Amino acid sequence: GDGTVTINEVLSNDLAYDHPTAYALNNIYPNPFNQITTIEFSVPDNNNEKVRLRVFDIAGRMVRDLTNRPYTSGIYKIEWDASHLSSGIYFLEFRVGSLRDIRKINLLK
């Protein structure tokens, strides 16, 4: 299969943290990871742009399209199960409109 993707909204008592002011790829943990990693990102108020998260292998082939939809304001976590993939270096692309952030992730089995 394609693995599992779980999307959760993170809640916090810190008001500034609950209401981000910009789109951002915050954290990927653990990294390196053995099967499951968590990707955290922020979505600001008054948005209607789609958040797209994709994973590419070292050769530039897309191996997973994690999400491609608008989100309401908040901090989100996506858990990605990569157990069906081989060990190696992968690249996570976070894209919203003209914003593009790429991070290297390392799958160790």
Residue ranges: model-predicted function:
Residues 56-63, 90:
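Short, glycine-anchored, charge-dense loop/turn motifs used at functional sites
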Residues 34, 46-48, 61, 87, ...:
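A generic structural motif
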Residues 65, 69, 73, 79, ...:
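C-terminal tail/sorting-segment detector
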Residues 1, 8, 26, 42-44, ...:
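A structural detector for beta-sheet-dominated domains
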Residues 12-29, 33-55, 72, 77-80, ...:
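Glycine-centered coil/turn sites that cap beta-strands in beta-rich domains
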